[in-house]
Structure formats: structure tokens, C-alpha cells
Amino acid sequence: MLPSNFNNCQVSLDDALKELQELKSSNELDFEIRIVREITDREECLDMVLGTNLPQGSELENGKLVDLVVGIKKNETTDTIKETEYELYLQKLNDKNLTDLNLLTSPVFGTSNVNQLIENQELITYIKSENPLNYKFLFSEAQGIIYGVDEKNNVIKLLDISIKTVREKESGLHTFDFVKFDSSNYLLLTYSGTDGNYYLSAFELLPENEVGDEIVLIVFELQNDNNVHFGGKILQEEDNLFLCLGDLNSPGNSAKFDSPWGKVMYFNKNDLFETPITSHDDPRINYIVYGLRNPWSCFEHNDKLVIPDVGSIHWEEVNILSNYLNAEEPVFLGWPWLESYFDANYKNTPVDEQTKQNQLENAVFPQYTYPHANDYCAIIGGTELFSSEKWDGYFFIGDFCTGTIWAINVEKDSDIVVLEKNIVPFSITTINDSGNGTLLVGTTAGSILEIILP
């Protein structure tokens, strides 16, 4: 039975954990324990249990989830909570024999050098080196502007749609790419519009690096006044365009097919230029993945689809899908029922119980994961390096809060840290290929960094 004093700061986090572990041992129970931080102004409640997700006196049973809500100061978490959290996360991984998947234990490989190429811009959302405009690279800002950068690192404005979008949390301009249609080159981009819609649009590239008028290829209605969990990454394969979308902060979207959110889809690009897609049930849409929460990026790697999915409050995921175009049914990646390998404690019912069970039975789990511990918070993707023999077979992902960057080679079962935490003084937002064997990294502070790998 859940102790009656697990509320109103009557018991410390350490004592609560000891008591729960004793209950597990003495009663041969197997239930999950998590720590949930909650900001409090009460000094006496720091590192103390404010409450739980269960009514006091609840029966503790196998499979139950116990969330210990612990008081913290705003923007300050004590070492006690950090250490205890990480120990709990390690125990969860150990219980499922998953410790090898934890990226926080990856060894450090050499020392990378960091050069600042661009500074004093707005939040960077995407960077691309390969382009038909002869720029060294281009980058986008969340506020709705795309720039080209020449060989002297001069920044030249290419497109400004800031009147159509707004930077608010994760809303704004998300990504861009280039596509050829009827012998003309087009700039593609995704953005959340101020009119309550989400757009995949094209702009023809004209002489003198001018761009034509907007051609809407896809428009999806946004739900409510949402400003997070868009995704928006564009991929290409022959005549197909792929779009990776988040759940719009409505987890049920990811489990059902009455909206495009929380999914990866593809469609023939030629059809879009003739008639835009305006509904999630347009027959031209091919859904291939669902069960996503907030994929800031997705990318192809050695004929695989890599989807780093930002977790809720506990776990980050690296999903790697083989033969993703040949699956008979869309692949389910777990959300909202699972966060990584673990119960997400989602209680709403977007689908019936039988559908939920079928989804759980067929869920595909991430190949790598890491917990929200030791200041790590959100997974950022991602790229491979196409012009580097040394790093052939690897792809690169990072963590938003710490600036850590990992290199992963699935075939060699190798995951290593190539940029240690806290070297980059800003939160990183995107990791891309420079075309010269180095990484280009964007930040929330409007900087673009070149990472010269060891």
C-alpha cells in the first residue's frame, strides 16, 4: 500500500525511495518508480515529496507506475535529485537488460575543434550545404527568413516569409530543401502559418538569386493555438517527398489516423505541383510511420530512416528503420503509450483498448536511448557526412541542452561522443553536413558553428 505520508512535504525523496524499495522487496512486487520535478517556493519542500500520481493508500501492484513529485527551485535542481534520478534511470535500463543502449555511457573519442562561422542571427532551424545557388551553405531562422552564405561568410537574404509566420516556442519556419520540377529548381520549406495552418510550400528559383511567388503544395490545419511539436523535416527520394511531423502536443494524434500529426508520410512531388494536398486523408498520402512525439529531424542513412524523437519528461529515442518503404502497414514507434521502452503513463483513450494492445504488441523500439538526467534533455538530429572517408558509416546526433554530439555506426555497434557536453555555450538546434567532412551546427543564439571532428 502506498504510504500515507507521501504528500505535502512530509517525507524526503531519499526516504520515500528507500520505503518503496523495501515494499518491493518484502512483497515481491515489480512496479516502476519515477521522479517528477515541480517548482515550489516553499523552502521546506525542496527535495521533499509533494505528492504522487496515485491516491494515498492505493494498493501497489505489479506493473503499477509511481511518480514521486519532488519540489525544486525554479532553474535549480539539487545534486541530490540529479544523482537519484540517474540512479533510478540506470536501474530501469538494467532491469530490462538495456544498459548498452544508453548514450550517456558512450566513451569520448578524441577532441573536436569548434569554429564560429556565423553569429548574431536569430534562432537557427536548419542548415544545408548542397544547393543550386552556389552558396557555401544556406540556413533558416525560425522567424521566417532563409539566408545564403558565400565563401567569405557574407550572409545574404534569399527569402523572407516572416509576415506569414511567427517565432513562438517551436513555431515558425522549420526546414527547407531544393527540388527540381519541369526543368526548374524550387526552394521547398515548411512553416506554421499565422492563419492557423501548416504549410509545405515551393518558391521557384529565378535568375540573380531571386525567388518566385509561393506555391502551396500541402496545407494542414493546425489544432487549437498550438506552438510546439511540429517536426517539419523534408526528405527526398527520387520523385517522392517525405514529411516528418510531430504530435502538436496532443499525444492522441500519434495513435490514430484522423490527422497527419505524429507521423511520417510520403507523396509524389509531381502531383503536388498540379494539385495541393489539403487533408490528412488525401489518397496520395502514404503513411509509413506513426507513434511519434516530436521529431525535430529525420534523415536517411545507408538506406535506413533515422528518426530522433524528443521524449516527454524521461527518455530520448533514436529510432532506426530498415526497409521502411516495404512495410505492409505503417510502423508504430510507441508514443503515446511508451516513452522509449517504458510506460508513458498516458491515460486518455484516443483509440479503443484492442487497437491500443495491437499497437503495443507490434511496436518497434528505439535502437538507442538516454534519460533526462545530468542536464541532458532533448535529442537533436542529425546527419551523415558524405565526403568523409574516416566517418563513413556513421551518423551524428546531439542533445539540445548540453551540446553533446554523438557519432553512431549501427553496423559496427559503435556509439561514441565526438563533442563533450557544455563545450558549446548555447543550446544546439540542428546538426548538418558541411560538404567538407565537418559538421555545421545551429544554435538558439543565432550562431552557426563548424565542428572539426577528431
Tell me what each language-model feature is.
Residues E87-L98, P132, S171-L173, D247-I416, ...:
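Beta-propeller domain segments
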Residues L13-L17, G231, W261:
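Extracytoplasmic/secreted envelope proteins and their assembly/folding machinery
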Residues E19-N27, G57, G71, Y126, ...:
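Structured segments of extracytoplasmic/periplasmic soluble domains
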Residues M1-E85:
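Ligand-recognition elements built from short beta-strands and adjacent flexible loops
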Residues G71-K74, L205, N268-K269, L321-S322, ...:
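Short beta-strand-to-coil "C-cap" segments at the C-terminal boundary of structured domains/repeats
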Residues M1-Q10, T77-D79, V108, I163-K164, ...:
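Second-shell loop/turn segments in exported
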Residues E38, G57-E59, G71-K73, A142-G144, ...:
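Solvent-exposed coil/turn segments that connect beta secondary-structure elements
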Residues I81-P251, S297-G311, D375-K412, S434-L453:
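Acidic, Gly/Ser/Thr-rich repeat motifs that build Ca2+-stabilized beta-propeller blades
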